[in-house]
């Protein structure tokens, strides 16, 4: 109780000295607080937009349902209604890297105005507006403070990697994850779809690939993928598939053994098995598969992995070793040959390649347009941006690790502070402009739909804010009360996000955690959303 | 996929060499595997007991509902029914430390026999029986292996501490926690009810105590407590309240300021405020409060905390400092005086005191009957058992810590291995017989009902097995496949327990996590259970 009072005073002091006075996460770029506080009754807030959009309609309906978590318990209101007027200046719904996500929000007595260039900026504004509605438990009432906000993200790529290979993640859980990412203003879902242990993606061209799934019922159909892409679009979240090759390819070989290298000495670790790149049929296979899969996504980027290739397996496979000798290839040459061939496929499917930083570490010259996701270290990142590549930071944001930054806190959840401290430009002295953002990763060796939420939240909030807010927004003590409000709010929305300090979060009596999305899109909605 | 195969072979090898061939957690003392495997159809297993017991009836109904998680999806069975015949030799339902929890289980073609001294041993046997029923996803079928098991726990005190002070834990969530503890054969719920930040326990004698609760709706009534005690009894789980005094007492002072010491220099940390023991009214208050509360519990033990007393606060309070001078008391003397007075109350309410090890560290001579819960270290434990006290191990089992045993794993969940390795007798050379068990602790600074399951499970399974199984059952690699089955099974039962390695756990399509118990007891059932 006294700790609560201390936090309360901390917030009060923050207001007095003008720092982060709003409980909004990620913290907006510009905030100007007014003097009025407007009571709002459940059901009294209506959203009206100046444009017709199937995609944005879903977003408006979603937030209208989220504004008042305890509305079922309230008396019907006789108060007047408030209209949140949304002005969107362009009806262009193109969702690609670099779209304008800015918005402005003005709350005054009698006037709620949200303005944005496009629907995606408006979605960010709706989330901020939702967070401004404060619930008072003792009075069972809601209010909103008068405020003027002007906001836009620091980085255009605010990604989250979901691994649906180490454990199968049902489609509904992936949609549920998207809810949580959208609430936190992440804008990119990096879908690590397949890996050494499992190939859960259905292919019409190569139906035996899903023999590499954990179970016939643990697979993603084309319809599943399209639903995920459409659902993500209702949050302004791009979806980028990863097919991790040439390493981590054992699961490809369950249905198509000829695709993978044979190396008994390495086979005890399933992660050691790469594709057999000596066989031209392998490249035909990749070409055909990606030609089938890529159109299910709308994004210009396509992730081809490239990490942790075990070239020793290639050398142990006589056919591959002979081919390398014949070609006069070192292992680096062979890896280079693979990446060069992959570029041909990327061009034919009209996609820009993303890889992990491993090919570069291995001496491979990547196509200069390749986007490099750095999981190794800040010094590797410095070299990569100096070489002119655009890059994503991931090394600091491994949510699976016990000690992500080698810091030891008392509580495991306090690792959020390490994520928060990891500014993408830390120790980067030159070419920082080549860093276009970053990605949190939740590798799934010890994750399935049951524990994903709690292992990710509230810790990933620190990453979300780092990627969106100004670099100067970096105080743990100022962030803490804001995150406290937000994590409680996430729980009420059905996202399992625990607390970071002793406090009280009133929740709905009938709250259950469903591992399902908050909105069910119909087939016709999916079609409308994808075609716009 | 290949990793799965490796695990499969590991299990096969274990069977061949006779080690832990059953996927049962905690592993039983004696197992003899037969040669037959019996197919069982959903709904076909009936349980029949030779005694009438309201308490055991709840347990039988519960398990009957749990045997077939996918039964709703199955065709009605035309197979024959199987009768699990339960023989209980005594109808004595006394639930106290040291009751006989042994059972034997014999599964043969046409005969399922569970035998136990009392209903609590029979409950352990039902849990083992449940774990023996194996689900085959591809065939959507169930089977059970022929086996003969004779089992009993290594330690009589297998406890779990739940902190409902740092965050309020709704009654339904405490009942849900009891489900998870019962499934894992924990037998003691140590309910850390109040602490510095909150006093959520309603008192009819002192109604202002709940002014120290986070909210008027964040409290436990007498009825709530009795429901918890009755519900725990349906799992053979004892419930022991902790009222942590004389330190950590700030929340007592919200409603009754005269109870607590005043020390401005220490007040910045709410944990620093102890009771004012110079005031005789404090002891009257404790006496009256405990006289009211103790009868709500049926256990002979009562935990009075005693940890982290900040005597500096006493010395800064002029009234207390003057009283100490008058009495000629050092701080140790004052602490001794407090514990001596507490013993008088314990005697009057007919309870045996438990404290944390701090009074002993402080030089206090505790009543020799005091049970000491050691949270500091193994060397302290050695000294305490050498002094003749009975003791509980807790220091190795702090579930809140990032690095519980200062070991760094790659994944946070792998800290289960540290818990598993922590044998209570590690580094104990003498008087190990004074260790009567141990307790996992889940302190709640960063825990509420939303994230408790995932932060506790599957890691606490390692503790459950350490306290139940033979000391020689200590191989991580042999435990892993068993825990893999069990954690999947926990999920299907509604307990959020994640995986420890890449695998596939088929779950019900309609599975939701409710933070509620699997059984709702009626008021008349609660009365019947408590009165037996």
From Swiss-Prot, chains A, B:
Keywords: Glycoprotein, Glycosidase, Hydrolase, Lysosome, Signal. It catalyses: Hydrolysis of terminal non-reducing N-acetyl-D-hexosamine residues in N-acetyl-beta-D-hexosaminides. It is an enzyme of class 3 (hydrolase). GO terms for cellular component: lysosome; membrane. Its EC number is 3.2.1.52. PANTHER family: BETA-HEXOSAMINIDASE (PTHR22600), BETA-HEXOSAMINIDASE SUBUNIT A1-RELATED (PTHR22600:SF54). This is Beta-hexosaminidase subunit A1. It comes from Dictyostelium discoideum. The lineage of its organism: Eukaryota, Amoebozoa, Evosea, Eumycetozoa, Dictyostelia. The gene is hexa1.
């Amino acid at each position: 109780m006294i700790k609560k009072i201390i936090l309360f005073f901390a917030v009060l002091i923050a207001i007095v000295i003008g720092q982060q006075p709003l409980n909004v996460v990620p913290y907006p770029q510009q905030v100007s607080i007014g003097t009025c506080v407007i009571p709002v009754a459940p059901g009294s807030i209506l959203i009206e937009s100046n444009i017709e959009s199937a995609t944005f309609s879903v977003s408006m309906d979603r937030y209208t349902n989220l504004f008042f978590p305890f509305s079922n318990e309230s008396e019907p209101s006789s108060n007047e209604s408030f209209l949140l007027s949304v002005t969107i200046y362009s009806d262009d719904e193109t969702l690609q890297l670099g779209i304008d996500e800015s918005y402005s929000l003005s709350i005054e007595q009698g006037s709620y105005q949200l303005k944005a260039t496009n629907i995606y900026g408006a979605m960010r504004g709706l989330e901020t507006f939702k967070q401004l509605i404060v619930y008072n438990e003792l009075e069972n009432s809601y209010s909103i403070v008068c405020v003027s906000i002007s906001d836009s993200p620091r980085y255009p790529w605010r990604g989250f990697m979901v691994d649906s290979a180490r454990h199968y993640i049902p489609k509904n859980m992936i949609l549920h994850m998207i809810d949580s990412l959208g609430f936190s203003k992440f804008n990119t879902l990096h879908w690590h779809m397949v890996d050494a242990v499992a190939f859960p993606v259905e292919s019409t061209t190569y139906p035996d690939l899903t023999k590499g799934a954990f179970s016939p019922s643990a697979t993603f159909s084309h319809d599943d993928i399209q639903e995920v892409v459409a659902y993500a679009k209702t949050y302004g979240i791009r979806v980028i598939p990863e097919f991790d090759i040439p390493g981590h390819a054992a699961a490809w070989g369950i249905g198509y053994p000829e695709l993978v290298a044979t190396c008994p000495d390495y086979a005890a670790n399933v992660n050691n098995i790469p594709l057999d790149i000596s066989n031209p049929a392998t490249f035909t296979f990749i070409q055909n598969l990606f030609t089938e899969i890529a159109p299910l996504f709308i994004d210009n980027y396509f992730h081809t992995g490239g990490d942790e290739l075990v070239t020793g397996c290639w050398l142990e496979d006589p056919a591959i070793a002979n081919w390398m000798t014949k070609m006069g290839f070192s292992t680096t040459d062979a890896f280079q040959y693979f990446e060069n061939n992959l570029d041909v496929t990327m061009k034919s499917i009209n996609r820009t390649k993303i890889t992990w930083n491993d090919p570069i570490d291995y001496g491979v010259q990547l196509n200069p347009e390749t986007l490099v996701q750095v999981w190794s270290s800040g010094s590797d990142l410095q070299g990569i941006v100096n070489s002119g590549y655009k890059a994503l930071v991931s090394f600091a944001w491994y949510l699976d690790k016990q000690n992500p930054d080698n810091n030891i806190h008392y509580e495991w959840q306090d690792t959020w502070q390490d994520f928060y401290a990891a500014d993408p430009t830390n120790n980067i002295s030159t070419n920082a402009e080549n860093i276009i953002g970053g990605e949190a990763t939740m590798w799934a060796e010890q994750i399935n739909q049951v524990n994903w939420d709690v292992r990710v939240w509230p810790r990933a909030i620190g990453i979300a804010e780092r990627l969106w807010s100004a670099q100067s927004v970096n105080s743990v003590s100022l962030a803490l009360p804001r995150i406290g409000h937000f994590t409680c709010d996430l729980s009420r929305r059905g996202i399992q996000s625990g607390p970071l300090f002793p406090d009280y979060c009133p929740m709905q009596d009938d709250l259950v955690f469903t591992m399902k999305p908050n909105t069910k899109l119909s087939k016709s909605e999916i079609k409308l959303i994808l075609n716009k």
